[in-house]
Amino acid sequence: MSARLVDDLPRPSGVPGLRVWLKSSGYARRLLLGEAGDPWESAPRFLSFFTQAHGLLRPDVAVVDVGDLYRSWVARHPALKAEMAAKSRVAFPLRRMLEEEGPRKLLTEVVEAVAASLRGQTPLVLALPAPRRWLTEAAGFAGRTAVTVDTDAVESAALYMADFVRVVGALPIGGLLLEEDEAASDGDLEATRPLVNVARHYRWGLALRGQAAAGSDELDSLIGAAPVAGGDLAQGLDVSQELWSGAPVAELGAGQFYFAEIPEGAEPESVLQQLSRLRA
């Protein structure tokens, strides 16, 4: 395994690579810290949490969930919520949130600590909500229950996010994962150009969990429930639903790997059994 995500991705040409990518922060938090536990209170606390979770689950990708960082920070700093609500522009809450110095400093400390613990053996990936999704979430933090997000707002969000991730540009990050939701639009990937440019500048791999159409050639990996034909794109088969329902899981083809989100309330014995299915 390598510190760079692109070096570890399988390719349709037959080049082997990683096999199991997990989204496990909610499950690991409940299991290791309890229902109310928060690993983001400090960098040492997060490192302890991360090393325990990583040792238990042994994923092929080490993920730091930046969305979780900000959910924790906003919950612990109510004054920031008020500042995020100060202006009516749809992108302002996200802009104000990402400008906050405290989370930037904490993320830098966490990435430094986690990267040192990995020692270049596993790619370190920052997982972020995709711009449209993060706009909506930040608006919710600011008390806005309904917002209309157009392509211009998505482009603005991508600019703010690109500026934000530069804070860790000098650190050994292997890639970025953008996670969409059901509100994603066909033009969203093209609107994320600032993030694409930053990823290319720092030689980070770029993965998307969602449904990409136009612009998918900008990605190194696309993660979804159904494979996409053509190209040299590494494809993550999202088997979360099948895995935890006990349904059969598709065999991997060339250039494919498994992606699974572990339910927060899953039983540890069941989790280890199901992960064994993916690794068999």
Locate predicted features.
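Catalytic-face loop-and-helix region of soluble metabolic enzyme cores
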Residues: 209-280
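Active-site-proximal, glycine-rich beta->alpha crossover segments in alpha/beta enzymes
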Residues: 74-167
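Generic structural signal for well-ordered alpha-helices
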Residues: 6-9, 47-54, 107-115, 162-165, ...
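A contiguous, surface-oriented mixed alpha/beta subdomain in the mid-to-C-terminal portion of proteins
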Residues: 149, 162-225
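A cross-domain feature marking catalytic cores of carbohydrate-active enzymes
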Residues: 24-26, 66, 126-130, 180, ...
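N-terminal basic, low-complexity leaders that serve as flexible interaction/assembly modules and, when applicable
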Residues: 1-71, 257-280
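Glycine-rich, proline-tolerant flexible connector loops at the mouths of alpha/beta enzymes
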Residues: 42-43, 61-102, 175-186
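Short, well-ordered coil/turn segments that N-cap beta-strands
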Residues: 14-18, 56-61, 119-124, 172-174, ...
